[in-house]
Amino acid sequence: IVVHGDAAIAGQGLIYEVVQMANLDGYKTGGTVHIVVNNQIGFTTNYLDGRSSTYCTDVGKVTLSPVLHVNADDVEAVVHACRFALDFRMEFKRDVFIDLLGYRKYGHNEGDEPRFTQPKLYKSISKHKNPRDIYADLLISEDIIDVDYIKSLEKDYKNSLESELEDSRKQDKTVITPFMQKDWLNYKRAKVKLMLDVVDTTYPKKKLEQISKVISTLPKDKNFIRKIKRLVESRKVMFDQDKLDWAMAEHLAFGSLLEEGYDVRISGQDVERGTFSHRHAVIKVEDSEEEILLLNNISDSQGQFYIFNSLLSEYGVVGFDYGYAMASPKTLTVWEAQFGDFSNGAQIMIDQYISSGENKWKTPNGIVMLLPHGYEGQGAEHSSGRMERYLQLCAKNNMFVADCSTPANMFHILRRQLKASYRKPLIVFTPKSLLRHPRVTSKVEDFSDGCFQPLIDDNKANAAKTNTLVFVTGKFYYDLLEAKENLLRDDVALVRIEQLFPLPKKGISKILSKYKNVDDIVWAQEEPRNMGALGHMLLHFEDVKNWRTASRRSYSAPAAGSATRSKLSLIHISEPTRPLEI
């Protein structure tokens, strides 16, 4: 059941997104009853200024859903409409709308004066009988009840209210009962210390090998295009050669969780194949287009793997997946943006629910957001997941924000989401160019025996020789590494911060203590100076001496529209012999 206001259902684009989900496999609910509290006014805006359609419920025509327009003063008609709507929903598993046409007796809130903006309307409302009296008069006129019965009902109801009020005054504090309490009984409320503790995400090598065989074996009795055959078979080769790439990290993370009995749900635009053609979680049979999900073939007792290409929506789909994660703490619920830049279409969900829902309503949530991020010359709308905005929302213990640079770390951070004794939203800035980068591979033992590393030291740097200590995150590390090697700079150490929040402060302090001889400490980022993680890092490096920034200069847009200019900017940042900011 979804309750709307008349102004909102007509004016909010989210409504259209949700209505379009009604019959889609990944999002349908078996029918939704939409109840519109239609008071013919939106705060101070008249309905004639609030929509172009005749009815506020005309959005229901998109799915040919029935709409019941009912007079809110007619109690029996309202009950009849609600019963009919529910019967329709249960019988046909489709949406139905109830347009409950009434009025708002007072202002938008207790202190509001509605006669400022609708004097004529409120003159009529002030003279209008309320629904209780209208219905009472009807029942009395039909000799069904008498006045004494009405007075008795009113007295009992007022006594009940007074009793509840007195009980509430005796309580020292108000306790919020968590939504879906039973599903969340065995989960802890994690503070920062617990969030920084190592979670055991190891997984037996033999089982990893079994999963690799499953995801690299196509049914022999079906035809597939040559490219997909080659791609799927390469997964086993990769495992045997002990060089696992990003796609394998994802598949093995999902497969290992499924084998342990957890469910996995992935949703978003083009997620079945992956925007950058790396995932191929759904394989299409060439002749029939039958869909094959190899991750559902791991074992008879495994969890269920669900993956859905979403409609072209961010706000509605992120909202749906947030709700799904709220109801399913034992499911890895993943929403992936087509490009990280597009997640701003869901900004309301991120601001009001994902970043602050647990703090406001005591409702934990383990949703994962994967945001492809990185500067490869694709322009302002295809380069940045707006890292700075997510980090600005971080406080105390509200969520994880990460920017992984190795497949193994991606494997472990996904497993950590369900292996931890708590649930927190996880924002991961994922790579694009690293998906097939020859240096971006991990060994099988990094998966089977390792754990998530929030901080990765430079294992090739000689601390005694190091003069410049560079902190960096994500994909940009490989650009700096290439520049360091080309320039033969053995006096530079590159340290990767893989988890941006909560920040591994103790680990960073150990790194600073280790490199005692440095006189140049750098935070390096490929984003402009007014974006990226710089603002977040300033809060934590403000007391560090000899600290500076290497970045692109401040821009209004996240990236340049020219690939050539973007590459030149990168060279200026990554080569210390040139200006570190342009």
Residue positions per predicted region:
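ASCE RecA-like P-loop NTPase motor cores
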Residues: K220, L257-L258, V264, E272, ...
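Single conserved hydrophobic/aromatic residue that forms the stacking wall/gate
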Residues: I571-I582
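Short acidic (Asp/Glu) and glycine-rich catalytic loops that position anionic groups and cofactors
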Residues: I35-N39, V59-P66, N109-Q118, N130-E142, ...
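Glycine-rich ThDP/TPP pyrophosphate-binding loop and its adjacent helix/strand module
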Residues: I1-R169, D341, E376-Q378, K396-S513
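Acidic beta-strand-to-loop metal/phosphate-binding motif
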Residues: L100, V518-E527
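Hard-cation-handling environments
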Residues: P131, E142, V147-V264
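Thiamine diphosphate
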Residues: I1-F43, Y47-D58, V67-K93, L244, ...
